[in-house]
């Protein structure tokens, strides 16, 4: 390893320890020429992942984009950033373990939804509404029904009617909604 001070290429390792949760190794080194000490980090270099978008375009996987989407889904829910980072780490590790270096945005979206379902139903629905491009309150009701435990009976008709009645009050936004109110 080249000394950052004198550029001599020989150094000895004084100490090594795991860093960044085991994702890197921190090494304290000493230059054999000038005796100065410096620190280096050794990390795994991952082969880049390519994301295939809905329209067929390909772009490099962007961890920060995934992180922003998940943070937005949680909103002001108060979940710790460390938990969101851990979730992104899990999803990224899952993608890195795949043999194929290309992944569809749909596969990433489903992985996020699966993880959010376990963490926060509110964040799950918020993410699903953008990812699945909800167009009406009915889409929300349908998604909420998938979250219910199977032993529950049908949805509360009063709550569903209130949701749909609210949508019916604004038919210019959702012309199909007037048909939905009578289904409950």
From Swiss-Prot:
GO terms for molecular function: ATP binding; DNA binding; zinc ion binding. Residues 49-139 form the ATP-cone domain. It comes from Cyanothece sp. (strain PCC 7425 / ATCC 29141). NCBIfam families: transcriptional regulator NrdR. The gene is nrdR. It comes from the Bacteria. The lineage of its organism: Bacteria, Bacillati, Cyanobacteriota, Cyanophyceae, Gomontiellales. Signal peptide: none annotated. A zinc finger (unnamed) spans 3-34. This is Transcriptional repressor NrdR. InterPro entries: ATP-cone_dom, NrdR-like_N, RNR_NrdR-like.
């Amino acid at each position: 390893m080249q000394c950052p001070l004198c550029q001599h290429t020989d150094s000895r390792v004084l100490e090594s320890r795991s860093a960044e949760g085991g994702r890197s190794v921190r090494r304290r080194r000493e230059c054999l020429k000038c005796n100065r000490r410096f620190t280096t980090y050794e990390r795994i270099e991952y082969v880049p992942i390519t994301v295939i978008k809905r329209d067929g375009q390909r772009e490099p996987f962007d961890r920060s984009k995934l992180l922003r989407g998940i943070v937005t889904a949680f909103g002001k829910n108060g979940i710790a950033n460390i938990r969101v980072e851990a979730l992104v780490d899990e999803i990224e590790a899952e993608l890195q373990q795949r043999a194929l270096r290309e992944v569809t945005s749909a596969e990433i979206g489903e992985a996020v939804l699966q993880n959010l379902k376990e963490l926060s139903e509110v964040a799950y629905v918020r993410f699903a509404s953008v990812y699945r491009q909800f167009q009406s309150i009915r889409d929300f009701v349908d998604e909420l029904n998938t979250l219910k435990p199977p032993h529950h009976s049908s949805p509360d008709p009063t709550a569903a009617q209130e949701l749909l009645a609210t949508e019916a009050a604004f038919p210019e936004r959702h012309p199909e909604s007037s048909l939905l109110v009578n289904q409950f």
